[in-house]
Design a protein with these regions (language model features):
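Small beta-barrel nucleic-acid-binding modules, primarily SNase/OB-fold domains
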Residues: 2-156
């Protein structure tokens, strides 16, 4: 019985989302940033979105938008997990606003459905941005960043 209770306790701890706060000291691109949290520097990959790569159409615009919104600002990150590169993957909040969602709403990022299937609000915002031709959706044929990365990996 104790083993079962202990297992349930450990499992429930793993389900609790970790939150970190800090100041954004660098925006690498439209979905990655560097956070100064106390004495630690933490690389954060924004959950559920995929922004154009910097060498891709609209990549610099996406980065610039994110910089204007959160660079040198104090934010909160609800950490979902850690990726294979050691980055914290999470939802970024500035003044309680979901910046990940905002990046999709404004056409600055794609909804990364593969990693965030349950994010119905993200899916809805993605479709709305496409219909309104906002941001990267002004292009007639925008390329999914994932496909761009795959194509350019072959050329290296």
């Amino acid at each position: 019985m104790r083993k079962i209770l202990f297992s349930i306790f450990i499992f429930s701890l793993s389900m609790i989302a970790v939150a970190i706060s800090g100041k954004v000291i660098k925006v690498s691109d439209g979905d990655t940033l560097l956070l100064q949290s106390g004495s630690k520097r933490i690389k954060v990959r924004m959950y559920g979105i995929d922004a154009p790569e910097l060498k891709q159409n609209y990549g610099e615009d996406s980065k610039s938008y994110l910089e204007k919104r959160i660079l040198n600002k104090n934010i909160d990150v609800k950490v979902i997990n850690e990726d294979k590169y050691g980055r914290k993957v999470g939802k970024v909040f500035y003044k309680n606003k979901d910046i990940n969602l905002e990046m999709i709403e404004t056409g600055n990022a794609w909804f990364y459905e593969y990693h965030a299937k349950k994010e119905k609000e993200y899916r809805k915002a993605f479709k709305s941005a496409q219909e309104q031709k906002l941001g990267l959706w002004k292009d007639k044929n925008p390329q999914n960043p994932r496909n761009f990365r795959l194509e350019n990996k072959r050329e290296d």
